[in-house]
Regions:
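Acidic, Ser/Thr- and proline-rich intrinsically disordered linker/docking segments
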Residues: 359-419
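Soluble, non-transmembrane catalytic domains of enzymes that act on hydrophobic metabolites at membranes
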Residues: 1-5
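Short, structured interface segments
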Residues: 204-219
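Short, surface-exposed beta-strand/loop "edge" segments at domain boundaries and coil↔beta transitions
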Residues: 267, 324-326, 344-353, 384-392, ...
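Cys/His-rich short segments
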Residues: 228-283
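Soluble catalytic domains of membrane acyltransferases
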Residues: 14-21, 25, 34-206, 222-223, ...
Length: 419
C-alpha cells in the first residue's frame, strides 16, 4: 500500500541512458584532473593493452574520489555509470546529461539490466559499483551471485578497478575529515570476452570475488602508510559499536585517536599505521576489520538463536522524485528473520504499508551523517518506485541493521549457494 502523495508521479528510473557526447568525456576528465590537484595518486593498468570498448567495469567503492580517479583512466572513452537515485538530488538533468543510469539500491530493477545491455550495444563502457555503497570498514562488502549472470549475458570483457587508499583518505564513518594519504587505482582486465563465453556463471563469480578482494588496513600496514592526524579515530564508533571486552552494544565513543567503552571503561589507541592497541590489558582485535567481522558474527548468532528482532518508531523522509525529500512523520519499522522489513505509517490521513521480504533484500543502504539534508545516521529501505530514509531512535544501530539484513538474506538462500 503506497504513500498517499498529492501527486502520483514518481521519478522514472526505467529509461535508457543517453550516450555521452565525445566532448563531454574531455570535460569530465578536465574537471576530475582539477579536483585531484594537490592529491598524491598513482594510476596503473594491467592486461589492458589493446582493450577497446565495449566492456564492463566493476569497481570497489570508498569515496566520491573514486569517480574522479576512474575518469582519468577511461578518458577519452564514453562511460555510463550506474548511480543511486540520491545522487540525482536536485540535479537529475545533470546526471542524465552525463549518461548516468539511475536505480534504487537493493531493488529488483529489471530495466537496469536492459540499460546495461544498451550501453554494451552502443559500444561503450559500463561502470558498476557492485557493493552498492561506500565500504564501511575498508574491506569487500557483499557481492551478489547475479553479477556473474550479468557478465555472462553481455559477453564482453570484464575489468575490475581496485582503489587503494581512498578509504583511508576519506573513511565513510568520518568522510568530512580528509587525511593526507597516497591513493593507488588499478585497472585490471580480469576476463576476456572469450573467457566469459567459455566459463560458467559460478566460475565468473569466483573470478569476480577474487579480483575484488581488498583490505585497506592491511594495505596501510604493508605499505607503511602513516596517518598522523590527531583525530584519526573520531567516528569509528559508528562501525565498531559493540565492546569486545564487556559485550555491551552502543556504548562506544571516540576522542582524538582513541576509541573507548562508556560501560566498562576499556580504551584502545589507533596507531598511525591503522592498528589498534589496548591502553590496558589484552588487545582483542589489533586489526580493525576483525572487530567489525566479530560484530557481524554476534548478530548472526542472535538470528540463529531466534533472539533478533528490531522494532522502532522512526522519522521517515521519502524520495519518490529527485527534487526534495518529503517528511512523512513518524512510522513503525520492524525487521525480523521471517518478515524482513516492514514500515507502517500514515500520511495525509491515509495508512501506508511498505514490505521488503528477507529474500528480496541482500543488503541495507545506510548513511553516516547523511549529507543531503538531515545530518544524522539513517538507513534507507527502497522499493522499485520510492525510497524511505529512516532516522532511528538510536542512531548507532544502523551498522547492526546492515549486518542483520545481510545475514538474514544469506540464511534464506539455498544451502548450496550460501556465502
Amino acid at each position: 500500500m503506497e504513500v498517499n502523495y498529492r501527486w502520483k508521479k514518481h521519478y522514472k528510473t526505467a529509461k535508457y541512458p543517453i550516450r555521452q557526447p565525445k566532448w563531454l568525456t574531455w570535460l569530465i576528465w578536465f574537471l576530475s584532473k582539477c579536483a585531484l590537484i594537490g592529491k598524491k595518486y598513482k594510476l596503473e593498468t594491467i592486461d589492458m593493452e589493446g582493450l577497446e570498448p565495449p566492456y564492463i567495469i566493476f569497481s570497489n567503492h570508498m569515496a566520491f574520489i573514486d569517480f574522479e580517479l576512474s575518469a582519468m583512466v577511461t578518458y577519452p572513452k564514453r562511460v555510463n555509470n550506474v548511480v543511486n537515485i540520491d545522487g540525482y538530488h536536485m540535479m537529475p538533468w545533470l546526471l542524465t546529461w552525463i549518461g548516468s543510469i539511475c536505480t534504487r539500491k537493493f531493488t529488483n530493477d529489471i530495466h537496469l539490466v536492459k540499460s546495461i545491455r544498451r550501453v554494451v550495444q552502443n559500444g561503450d563502457i559500463l561502470c558498476l559499483y557492485p557493493e552498492a555503497r561506500y565500504t564501511p570498514i575498508g574491506t569487500t562488502s557483499f557481492l551478489p551471485d547475479s553479477l556473474g549472470r550479468l557478465v555472462k549475458m553481455n559477453k564482453v570483457p570484464l575489468v575490475v578497478v581496485t582503489h587503494h587508499g581512498n578509504y583511508l583518505y576519506s573513511p565513510f564513518w568520518a568522510y568530512k575529515n580528509k587525511r593526507k594519504v597516497p591513493m593507488h587505482t588499478v585497472f585490471r582486465q580480469v576476463l576476456t570476452a572469450q573467457q566469459v563465453q567459455e566459463m560458467t556463471v559460478d566460475q565468473i563469480n569466483a573470478a569476480i570475488r577474487s579480483a575484488m578482494e581488498y583490505d585497506e588496513y592491511r594495505y596501510q600496514l604493508e605499505n607503511n602508510i602513516r596517518i598522523t592526524e590527531p583525530n584519526r579515530a573520531e567516528g569509528l564508533q559508528k562501525v565498531l559499536y559493540q565492546c569486545p571486552h564487556c559485550g555491551t552494544e552502543f556504548q562506544m565513543a571516540t576522542s582524538g585517536a582513541e576509541i573507548f567503552c562508556n560501560h566498562c571503561g576499556k580504551r584502545w589507541y589507533m596507531e598511525e599505521n591503522g592498528q589498534l592497541r589496548a591502553i590496558d590489558g589484552e588487545t582483542e582485535f589489533p586489526h580493525i576489520p576483525d572487530w567489525f567481522e566479530w560484530e557481524r558474527e554476534q548478530v548472526r548468532q542472535q538470528i540463529l538463536a531466534g533472539e533478533y528482532c528490531y522494532e522502532d518508531e522512526v522519522d521517515i523522509y521519502s524520495f519518490p522524485r529527485c527534487y526534495r525529500f518529503i517528511p512523512l512523520g513518524r512510522a513503525k519499522v520492524r525487521h525480523s528473520f521471517d518478515g524482513g522489513f516492514t514500515i507502517d505509517g500514515h500520511y495525509r490521513g491515509e495508512y501506508y504499508h511498505i514490505h521488503r521480504p528477507p529474500k528480496s533484500l541482500n543488503s541495507l543502504h545506510v548513511e553516516y551523517d547523511f549529507h543531503r539534508f538531515r545530518k544524522e545516521n539513517c538507513f534507507d529501505v527502497s522499493t522499485e518506485t520510492d525510497s524511505f530514509y529512516c532516522y532511528p531512535t538510536n542512531p548507532d544501530i544502523i551498522t547492526k541493521l546492515a549486518f542483520a539484513t545481510e545475514e538474514i538474506y544469506k540464511l534464506h538462500l539455498p544451502t548450496k549457494v550460501k556465502v
